[in-house]
């Protein structure tokens, strides 16, 4: 049944792309505020959010959604209704084909465009890994198809739709997938709240499930004490989830080029209230739903197997697929399989389109972008991402980590620049200095300080005590902000 669903999904997205052929491959105005809002909201959600952060919540407990929800919703809404119109106004003056081109022209700094383009292209494969690991795990769990075949086939499908329909295909497919994600999330939320969490002794079983965590486990070392409480204040775990969920994800989201592009496509300034509603509703609904579901799985697995959800599933990336396959009726599982495919597709097609336009328009700057370069760059990065996906599959919390890497470095580098644009600042040298400071600091933190990535990339971890668990965006954002503010103040004196 799930194989038929997957084939039907491929037919639908292929048909939408086919009907979009001949549309603008680059930027174009949206015909409908609702379609752009659905596209924006759908792009904000992905398998990395559903499976990666759902799995993180299933491993750690309620401190994950409770820490994330308020800053996530507040920042996304504020950024869309306040920063979004400023970005739109800037491009009305400039008329750029991509967000990266617009930033460079706004600050009259080709170097800023090139730096952002290079960083974006360098980091996209890591975010692709997060998406592909998530959807690959799901396809394998629900169909039995080999993991490698699953991720290769899904990547080819995304590539084909982008080549066929360009930006028009991306927006229209996002709109369809956004509706699917909303419906699927509502079904999971209803079953979680009114069925799973209503079983006798649910809360006491969830508390007791913590006893299945063995002494000396990573959770204890990080400072976590139960599924229903926050970790010890200023412990490794507290710093990890606070800097990840309050800074990396919300701040990273509002600076990502593929999301800023949606703002540039708005019909007018009045569009942003509609865009903001969908931009908050779709990701917040999906993230909270699957986090609550994954946490609830611990009560079930403890009663039935005497294990926590991560022990029963075999890893954080497997918690959500395992729970949907075992804890929900088969008809619901089929719908949720479609939901995950939709979430993965919206993110991957935005990333692939961003990558091709960045290379063909922003790195190789010509009056008429070379489409052969655009398509060829997609093929090369897809191959690289597939190799990385297969190599990194099985790494602990790889989905959440790969997502945080992309969000963190972009967020640390770009937030002061974006805020500077909002306030009408146009000094390109200041923007470049701030960008370089944020990028260099966050990359250094990734390579030599952060507890997980430093071991993965260099094998060298400088001992900063509990601060090894602080996300790279925090030091990077401090440095980039100080540089931008200091240079701006010095110039005004």
Give names to the regions the model predicted:
Residues 67-162, 247-252, 342-350:
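Helix-loop-helix module between adjacent transmembrane segments
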Residues 1-52, 165:
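Membrane-interface "cap" regions at the ends of multi-pass membrane proteins
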Residues 23, 95-108, 165-176, 255-288, ...:
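Hydrophobic, small-residue-rich membrane helices and short re-entrant helix-turn-helix hairpins
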Residues 27-95, 248-252, 259-261, 268-303, ...:
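Membrane-interface helix-loop-helix modules in multi-pass membrane proteins
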Residues 1-16, 429-493:
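A generic transmembrane alpha-helix motif of multi-pass inner-membrane proteins
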Residues 4-5, 13-21, 124, 128-132, ...:
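Hydrophobic alpha-helical segments and their helix-loop junctions in multi-pass secondary transporters
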Residues 106-114, 121, 357-397:
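Loop-to-transmembrane helix boundary motifs in multi-pass membrane proteins
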Residues 7, 12, 42, 74, ...:
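Selective recognition of specific alpha-helical transmembrane segments in multi-pass small-molecule
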């Amino acid at each position: 049944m799930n194989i038929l669903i997957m084939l039907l999904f491929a037919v639908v997205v292929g048909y939408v792309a086919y009907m979009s052929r001949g549309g603008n491959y680059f930027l174009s105005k949206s015909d409908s505020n609702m379609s752009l809002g659905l596209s924006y909201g759908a792009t904000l959600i992905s398998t990395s959010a559903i499976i990666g952060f759902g799995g993180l919540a299933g491993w750690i407990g309620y401190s994950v959604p409770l820490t994330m929800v308020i800053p996530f919703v507040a920042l996304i809404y504020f950024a869309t209704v306040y920063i979004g119109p400023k970005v739109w106004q800037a491009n009305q003056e400039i008329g750029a084909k991509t967000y990266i081109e617009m930033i460079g022209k706004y600050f009259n700094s080709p170097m800023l465009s090139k730096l952002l383009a290079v960083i974006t292209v360098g980091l996209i494969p890591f975010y692709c890994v997060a998406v592909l690991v998530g959807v690959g795990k799901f396809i394998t769990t629900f169909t039995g198809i080999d993991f490698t075949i699953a991720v290769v086939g899904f990547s080819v499908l995304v590539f084909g739709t982008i080549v066929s329909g360009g930006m028009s295909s991306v927006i229209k497919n996002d709109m369809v997938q956004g509706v699917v994600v909303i419906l699927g999330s509502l079904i999971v939320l209803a079953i979680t709240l009114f069925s799973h969490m209503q079983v006798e002794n649910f809360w006491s079983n969830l508390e007791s499930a913590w006893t299945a965590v063995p002494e000396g486990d990573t959770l204890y070392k990080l400072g976590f004490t139960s599924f229903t409480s926050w970790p010890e204040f200023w412990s490794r775990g507290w710093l990890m989830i606070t800097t990840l969920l309050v800074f990396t994800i919300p701040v990273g989201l509002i600076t990502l080029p593929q999301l800023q592009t949606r703002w540039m496509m708005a019909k007018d300034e009045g569009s942003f209230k509609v865009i903001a509603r969908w931009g908050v509703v779709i990701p917040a609904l999906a993230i909270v739903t699957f986090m609550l579901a994954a946490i609830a799985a611990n009560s079930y697995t403890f009663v039935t197997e005497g294990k926590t959800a991560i022990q029963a599933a075999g890893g954080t990336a497997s918690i959500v697929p395992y729970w949907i396959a075992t804890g929900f009726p088969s008809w619901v599982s089929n719908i949720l399989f479609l939901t995950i495919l939709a979430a993965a597709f919206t993110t991957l097609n935005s990333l692939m389109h961003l990558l091709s336009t960045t290379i063909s328009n922003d790195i190789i700057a010509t009056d008429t972008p070379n489409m052969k370069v655009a398509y060829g760059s997609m093929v090369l990065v897809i191959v690289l991402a597939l190799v990385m996906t297969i190599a990194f599959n099985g790494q602990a919390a790889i989905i959440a980590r790969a997502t945080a890497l992309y969000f963190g470095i972009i967020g640390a580098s770009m937030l002061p620049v974006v805020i500077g644009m909002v306030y009408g600042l146009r000094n390109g040298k200041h923007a470049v200095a701030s960008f370089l400071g944020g990028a260099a600091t966050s990359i250094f933190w990734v390579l030599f300080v952060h507890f997980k990535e430093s071991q993965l990339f260099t094998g060298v971890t400088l001992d900063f005590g509990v601060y090894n668990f602080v996300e790279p965006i925090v030091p990077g954002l401090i440095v980039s902000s100080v540089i931008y503010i200091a240079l701006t103040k010095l110039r005004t004196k």
